[in-house]
Regions:
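Structural recognition of an alpha-helix C-terminal capping motif at a helix-to-coil junction
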Residues: 34-41, 54-66
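Arg/Lys-rich amphipathic alpha helix in sigma70-family domain 2
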Residues: 51-52, 62-82, 97, 149, ...
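Helix-turn-helix DNA-binding module
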Residues: 109, 113, 125-142, 156
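Sigma70-family region 2
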Residues: 38-55, 74-76
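Internal acidic/polar
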Residues: 70, 77-105, 128, 168-183
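C-terminal edge and immediately downstream basic/flexible tail or linker adjoining helix-turn-helix-like DNA-binding
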Residues: 6, 135, 152-187
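A short pre-motif secondary-structure segment
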Residues: 118-122
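A short, charge-rich alpha-helical start-of-domain segment used by transcription regulators
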Residues: 1-20, 30-33
């Protein structure tokens, strides 16, 4: 039998990670919050199904993932908001960097569900490849392949050609280089 107090503490410790993962797979904060709530209720109800000493984080993420796919099947007839009205209301500040966060979010949303999920579990949620494979219910090699394909596809969609695409733009880099050179002369 699982100790309710320790179970509650472990569950509460994972709420932020569960919410972040839920937001990333749903693309909608309200649905993500509902998904986390459903996950917590299911986990608490099935507390005795959890084996103490095993990875509670992986167990919770598996519940969340399974709940998401069950809800997805139920909501398959809902019409999604394409953001057309919101895009006319919001104006983004001019960016000097090569990559805008919204560009990344759009590209991430275009990945196949299995690739996006694998990438988020390992890249953003900090799970090992083995843990992600367990959560997704697939082989380790499958997770590695999904992540590799997701990274390659994101690179294509975002026109990333090198690591420099993630760093400062040319103007910022020149300013930083000039500051370094100026600092070296002062010595």
């Amino acid at each position: 039998m699982t100790d309710p107090d320790r179970f509650k503490d472990a569950l509460l410790a994972e709420l932020q990670s569960l919410r972040a993962f839920a937001i990333s797979i749903t693309g909608n904060v309200e649905r993500a919050d509902d998904l986390v709530q459903d996950t917590v209720v299911k986990a608490w109800t099935n507390m005795n199904g959890y084996t103490e000493g095993t990875n509670i984080r992986a167990w919770l993420f598996t519940i969340l993932r399974n709940t998401f796919y069950s809800d997805f099947r139920k909501r398959s007839r809902e019409v999604e908001d394409d953001g057309a009205h919101a895009s006319r209301l919001a104006v983004h500040a001019p960016q000097h960097g090569h990559m805008d966060l919204e560009d990344f979010r759009r590209a991430l949303a275009q990945l196949p569900d299995d690739q996006r999920e694998a990438l988020i579990l390992v890249g953003a949620s900090g799970f090992s490849y083995e843990e992600a494979a367990e959560i997704c219910g697939c082989a380790l090699g499958t997770i590695k392949s999904r992540i590799n394909r997701a990274r390659a596809r994101l690179g294509e969609m975002l026109s990333v050609t090198s690591g420099a695409d993630f760093g400062p733009d040319a103007d910022s880099y020149a300013a930083l280089a000039g500051a370094d050179a100026g600092g070296a002369k002062a010595d």
